[in-house]
């Protein structure tokens, strides 16, 4: 036994067991997130339950089965139910009934013993709406310009409404949004000239005429927008809900109409793919509990890229100074200790520092120096995407410094001496020999920085992230990239939907879907950086020997 321990074999097996447990845990977590997240997009079967309630009344419940659970019979002694006395538990179903304008909650529990009949009618319709969630029921009538039309016209009407909605969105965001932006810029220009005492009568008249012209364009676009909305609002669909009520739904509020129970496997697969595409390309709705997450995807990727651009040169330059130029003295040792300790500081502390120093001090000073015309409304003196990127750059700076130093220390000193002996300066040696060989280690530091920054939420809540951003940081208005704007983030979106949602049951699958998307983005960013690192490593492998 002693000989076996001395051979080192137990430690090899122990290490292998640790790696296996870690790998199984990671794969299990990914499987859990993927299975529950992807189920959010699969078209569910819509059931009709004929049942008897506690008062003995017959009623019908239409919806999709969201969850099942067993409860003790002892909790139901107050109900007059025909229950098998030998049973200890009873199954109950959580049904998503939708129709939020008719009932206060779009979920309800029903007991299996109360169900008298369960069917899957093929003519049940699921209507995905912009407000009030899904509607489940039967089509009674389709009205076009006040006249009833055949049900076969449904797809044609939906396509027409979709085209109108696209035109409305284009008018609102691109045309009307651009005019509003120019009017605001002109107002600030007038204010700036007033503060500088350079507003001449001629300049004031010119700016006034410019605003008048923009307002005239705005009126034309506003009339066109109203005309489009009138075209969209004239078509309606009359539905019959599960309680027999007739409900009129305007086509302008409809996103999609589907007969889930009629769909074949390939039909459901096609809808599954289309719903994933809509999830990653649409804006959120209904307090982030429905719709897509495109603004959050855009904000996450943009913030990570800005952070990478900031932290890469800072970390590499700091590592080069500490390893190549700084002497081995007490100050250098103190700096290394400080860098290592920074990696252990809680992320929320960085958020507080970013809010107090960058936002209030630096941003407030920038506003007073360069944006006085906007005061008291702050420009950079408020949380935004730039301060978020800088704060996370400081948070991940120790990772890049340590990784780069490790790469520099592995380069043989003979290569430095040989370069200097051939007449190269220290700067030329550093630029042409040292940095190319150390580039894989630099990329490793950047990979670790991206992985940590993409998942951080706590500091971002203080320095720039919001629940709903009205505008993206990147648009068609000069200067195109607006670093002062707030942004959405997938990590914060998960927290907001999971813990701040008014409808927890509806938001639960969305939490898993968003988490799966965040993991996918982080993996994609890391794999891109890893591929670059591997190419650099192969390119300079021969120089290391």
Enumerate the language-model features and the residues they cover:
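C-terminal transmembrane helix and the adjacent membrane-cytosol boundary/short C-terminal tail
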Residues: 326, 405-413, 420, 447, ...
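Membrane-embedded alpha-helices of multi-pass transport/permease systems
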Residues: 313-318, 349-352, 387, 394-415, ...
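Membrane-interfacial helix termini and adjacent extracytoplasmic/periplasmic loops
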Residues: 271-291, 350-394, 464-466, 473-481
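Membrane-topology segments of multi-pass transport proteins
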Residues: 1-16, 20-28, 34-288, 544-545
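Transmembrane-helix boundary motif in ABC transporter permease subunits
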Residues: 307-339, 352, 529-538
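Transmembrane alpha-helices
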Residues: 401-405, 411-412, 426-464
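Interhelical loop and adjacent transmembrane-helix boundary motif
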Residues: 287, 464-516
